[in-house]
Amino acid sequence: MAPWLQLLSLLGLLPGAVAAPAQPRAASFQAWGPPSPELLAPTRFALEMFNRGRAAGTRAVLGLVRGRVRRAGQGSLYSLEATLEEPPCNDPMVCRLPVSKKTLLCSFQVLDELGRHVLLRKDCGPVDTKVPGAGEPKSAFTQGSAMISSLSQNHPDNRNETFSSVISLLNEDPLSQDLPVKMASIFKNFVITYNRTYESKEEARWRLSVFVNNMVRAQKIQALDRGTAQYGVTKFSDLTEEEFRTIYLNTLLRKEPGNKMKQAKSVGDLAPPEWDWRSKGAVTKVKDQGMCGSCWAFSVTGNVEGQWFLNQGTLLSLSEQELLDCDKMDKACMGGLPSNAYSAIKNLGGLETEDDYSYQGHMQSCNFSAEKAKVYINDSVELSQNEQKLAAWLAKRGPISVAINAFGMQFYRHGISRPLRPLCSPWLIDHAVLLVGYGNRSDVPFWAIKNSWGTDWGEKGYYYLHRGSGACGVNTMASSAVVD
């Protein structure tokens, strides 16, 4: 492994490099009451995943269950605790040594999207070894002091992204000794600000440990960012990296080829020094995709809204729900591609407005009515990967649908983001957004990006990314509808 990759792996910043903190258990499981009926289906699914690959006679049996659910629309995230009974095993073909019957205490996290279950986490151990707090990461509040220090927010723009360019960041003063008290206070403010409720003390304790790990991770991202961005507490700070990626991002963007689009005609590379379609009436308000990986739909409707405004003179807020329900080439909350969405709009005969076909945040039956369609598109085009030409196209033609690597966005607060290229690879794009403008802040060039995570994220719902360096793959999947 290259030296800089070894360092980034040590810092826990490469995808999947750090496991999420395990969820703590409650020892007094005998006192659990009957489970809510809605917990049974996700629990059975988790049990099925637990037993997958096990020989007959060795499969565990479900015992007691408890848990909680967090909802958005019909998307549900279940945090479950269950006891499992493992049968004794005396078959030498299956077990090397005889194994007596034992009880396991497990925690599972299951995502349910219209009955489709995904197991996000499985953590099990014998009951007698699971005591309150045992699942928490060792020294959760101070693990950062052993690996990375209280790092300065400003540092040189090191273009040579190697081991030597970041190793000095490990040699600063350690984190303060009163960090646990500070973190508890910050977490309390987070809970109040974002109206979080947790089912039990164990769940709250576990979310606190996730929060602390996330703050350490945000500090590392802050230290290695070459822009002016500030990272820290956001509404996603109590979600593990895996939860965040599964619920809000769109890995289909890097896995599926999508429909082939023709290349857009060049408008040249002469662009005004700055441009912002928000101030010119071509951009609707920031929307919120909720617990649904539907960023692709919001990116496309935002582009079509702008194209319709520029060519027809009317700004309409268009329906993402129509695409979730009626675009059969894409996968609704499980992800999609802008190129497929353009084809779906064209084949359907247009888009209805948000008022007529409102967003639900989950897939339902297609209720598109051609009579209610307010806009149409004639075609779609792929744009240049040259950022100067992209800026010129945007200034002349309107907002652009793009896809980016969302590294660091879970903790983004404000400023111009510029992660190191190895951390924000252009080949690992997983989030679709909308370019609405560009400019400079204190001589730092940026793209102004409309996101779909609500106005309580980022700069009132907007993300600012470095322009001119191909940051996070912003130039790799740019496209637009064509409205004549």
From Swiss-Prot:
SMART domains, per database record: Inhibitor_I29, Pept_C1
Enzyme category, top tier: hydrolase
Tissues expressing the protein: High expression levels in heart, skeletal muscle, brain, testis and ovary; moderate levels in prostate, placenta, liver and colon; and no detectable expression in peripheral leukocytes and thymus.
Active-site positions on this chain: C295, H431, N451
Keyword Glycoprotein (UniProt): yes
Coiled-coil stretches: none
Signal sequence residues: 1-19
SUPFAM superfamilies: Cysteine proteinases (SSF54001)
Enzyme Commission code(s) on record: 3.4.22.41
Cysteines paired by S-S bonds: C292-C333, C326-C366, C424-C472
Sugar attachment sites: N160, N195, N367, N378, N440
Single GO BP term: proteolysis
Functional note: Thiol protease which is believed to participate in intracellular degradation and turnover of proteins. Has also been implicated in tumor invasion and metastasis.
Entry's family note: Belongs to the peptidase C1 family.
Protein name as it appears in the record: Cathepsin F
